[in-house]
Regions:
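Short strand-edge motifs at loop-to-beta-strand transitions and within beta-strands
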Residues: 88-92
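Short, surface-exposed alpha-helix to beta-strand junction/turn motifs within ectodomains of secreted
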Residues: 53-78
Length: 126
């Protein structure tokens, strides 16, 4: 192989090896935090107010950087986060809610630094 061919081959080889190692990374290293379970579920129609809201993600989240906000018929509702029970879960206490439609907005950070924002709607009452 000529010296010129070696110079051309190295970058291709390096790219192939880089791609190979990227594929070998565990999914959690590359994953954005995606909600895999919520209580209540999106668009739920509840007869009574839920005592708390739960969001479970597909990966660990940085609890200290996460936020949730609940908006109802009478405006914003304080929803303090509970201490973490598991690295992939967020729980927030909810005061008794009056009948109406509620919107939960959340913002999480995963260990890879990616931000995930989302909205969950539910209805309380008939």
């Amino acid at each position: 192989m000529s010296p010129t061919a070696l110079v051309r081959a190295r970058p291709r080889w390096a790219r192939l090896m880089g791609g190979f190692f990227a594929l070998m990374l565990p999914p959690a290293v590359c994953a954005h935090a995606i909600v895999v379970e919520s209580v209540p579920v999106h668009d739920a129609r509840l007869e009574t107010s839920p005592p708390r809201i739960l969001l479970r993600f597909n990966t660990k989240i940085e609890h200290g950087l996460c936020r949730v906000g609940l908006e109802g018929p009478d405006g914003d509702i304080e929803t303090p986060l509970d201490p973490p029970e598991a690295p992939e879960r967020l729980q927030a206490r909810v005061p008794p809610l009056v009948p109406g439609t509620y919107v939960l907005r959340y913002r999480t950070f995963s260990p890879d630094g990616h931000v995930t924002e989302g909205v969950l709607r539910f209805h309380v009452g008939k």
